């Protein structure tokens, strides 16, 4: 059975990276100061902050209908099945748009995703491995939508500028938070970005969270792998070393997807412990 996989830029991959893996790619759109960029094509997480400035006016939107139809028309006859794994349906209209369009095609399956970033990549590598072992396509397709309750993903913005610009934090609240050195702690859980709590000082909060996570999962550490994602944080090596010391494993370091960085701003860091086999991590390191 010949299967095509389609991802979007919420995975954190560029079109070139996805294609090297043998996957197809749909860019989400990022508007910066009234100019639209195709994420993963016109910009990526390496040059994003050369374009996005502190006071930039920004917004994000789903892939264009024309681009989706063009891709689907191109690949539907070349494969027995097409699996499309978009950004979490709770964060964007991308899933709804794809699902409506896919109804016109017999072999295109849209995953009702609760994932983004490296979690999407992990799910797809596991899916490919299972299909390669002749597991049921329908059963493995269902697993792509499953959220693992044991995993924890926490996100901490270093600055509040992007939260203010995006209307997620008032200027008055941001000013008070700056004086008090309060930082928000956001969790990504079951496909949603939710408030987890708050801390005092970015560095203190992050090191404390790394220590807390490491302690919580220490008894089952052989089955979990540490991951750090960041938006060009200049002090990333410090947190990498802290995770290594606390958990006993060197974390995988990745960049936050641009469609997330536009809302969290420069310096933001996400940390996670994910239950995954080492061969999956090795594939991520090798290909991405």
UniProtKB/Swiss-Prot annotation:
| Pfam family name, one | DegV
Write out the residues that bind hexadecanoate. 61, 92
What the entry lists under InterPro entries is as follows: DegV, DegV_C, DegV_domain_contain
Q: What are the residue boundaries of the DegV domain, all occurrences included?
A: 3-275
Could you name the domain of life of the organism this protein comes from? Bacteria
Name the job this protein performs.
May bind long-chain fatty acids, such as palmitate, and may play a role in lipid transport or fatty acid metabolism.
Against NCBIfam families, the record matches this protein to: DegV
Per its record, how is this protein called by name?
DegV domain-containing protein MYPU_3590
List the top taxonomic levels of the source. Bacteria, Bacillati, Mycoplasmatota, Mycoplasmoidales, Metamycoplasmataceae
């Amino acid at each position: 059975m010949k299967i095509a996989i389609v991802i979007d830029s919420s995975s954190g991959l560029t079109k070139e990276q996805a294609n090297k893996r043998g996957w197809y790619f749909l860019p989400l759109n990022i508007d910066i100061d009234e100019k639209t960029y195709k994420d993963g094509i016109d910009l990526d997480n390496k040059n994003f902050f050369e374009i996005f400035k502190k006071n930039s006016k920004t917004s994000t939107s789903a892939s264009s209908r024309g681009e989706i139809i063009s891709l689907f028309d191109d690949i539907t006859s070349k494969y027995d099945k097409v699996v499309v794994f978009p950004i979490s349906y709770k964060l964007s209209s991308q899933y709804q748009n794809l699902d409506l369009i896919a109804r016109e095609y017999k072999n295109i399956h849209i995953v009702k995703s609760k994932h983004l970033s490296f979690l999407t990549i992990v799910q797809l590598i596991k899916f490919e491995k299972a299909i390669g072992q002749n597991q049921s396509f329908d059963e493995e397709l269902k697993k792509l939508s499953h959220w693992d309750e044991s995993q924890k993903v926490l996100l901490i913005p270093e600055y509040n500028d992007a939260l203010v610009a995006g209307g997620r934090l008032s200027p008055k609240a941001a000013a008070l938070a700056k004086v008090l050195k309060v930082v928000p702690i956001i969790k990504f859980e079951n496909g949603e970005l939710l408030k987890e709590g708050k801390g005092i000082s970015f560095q203190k909060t992050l090191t404390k969270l790394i220590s807390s996570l490491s302690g919580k999962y220490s008894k089952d550490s052989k089955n979990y792998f540490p991951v750090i994602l960041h938006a060009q944080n200049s002090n990333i090596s410090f947190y990498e070393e802290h995770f290594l010391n606390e958990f006993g494993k060197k974390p995988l370091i990745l960049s936050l997807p641009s469609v997330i960085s536009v809302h969290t701003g420069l310096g933001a860091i996400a940390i996670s412990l994910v239950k995954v086999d080492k061969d999956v991590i090795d594939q991520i390191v090798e290909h991405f």
